[in-house]
Amino acid sequence: MLSLINHIKGEKIAYLAPAAEGNTWYPNRFIASRASNQPKLDSALATVKGLLDKVKEAGIPPEKTVIMGFSQGACLAVESAARYPQTYGGVVALSGGLIGAEGELTGYEGSLEGTPVFLGCSDIDFHIPVERVHETRDIMSGLGAKVDERIYPGMGHTINQDEMDAVNAIISNLLKS
């Protein structure tokens, strides 16, 4: 994610980018059962929650905070927002979706009222089934988020300029408010 900083436009932005031990946040696919990804999954979510708490304690309110990630980081971004709902400045998932096996995407409560959520993914991403992106869209919308889902034909597991433009739009709107 740090390599994307040069493509994000705006001043007075602080970035917190936690690094996963061994470059992986959890051992199995994000569509595997949550139990199969323990205890790493809970540890990863606690890391994100801890950072969100520190940012808030530093005087930066959630509505000025954007949670963003790519791949496993994208999954953690949307999962964290859904588990710890409040109005955020934005949530960005570049090639990711909510974590858990089919039937486990339940129990999300609270409100993301007005939070802009961007979900960008390829229709042929070998890590991310497009159906999970759609499920994530529906759940985040159900929590009150304003979801912008974009599915890119034939892109694969990468990030494109349109996605970066969407990220910059979220940040630009946030900096204006």
Regions found by a protein language model. Give the residues of each.
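Short beta-strand immediately N-terminal to the catalytic nucleophile in serine-hydrolase-like folds
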Residues: 67-69, 92-94, 120
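C-terminal catalytic histidine-bearing segment of alpha/beta-hydrolase fold enzymes
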Residues: 134-177
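A conserved short beta-strand
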Residues: 86-99
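Short beta-strand/loop motif that positions the catalytic acidic residue
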Residues: 118-121, 125
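Short alpha-helix in the alpha/beta-hydrolase fold that links the catalytic acid
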Residues: 1-5, 105, 129-139
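Gly/Ala-rich beta-loop-alpha elbow adjacent to hydrolase catalytic centers
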Residues: 68-73, 77
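Flexible "cap/lid" loop of the alpha/beta hydrolase fold
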Residues: 27-34, 96-116
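Serine-hydrolase catalytic machinery in alpha/beta-hydrolase-like enzymes
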Residues: 1-64
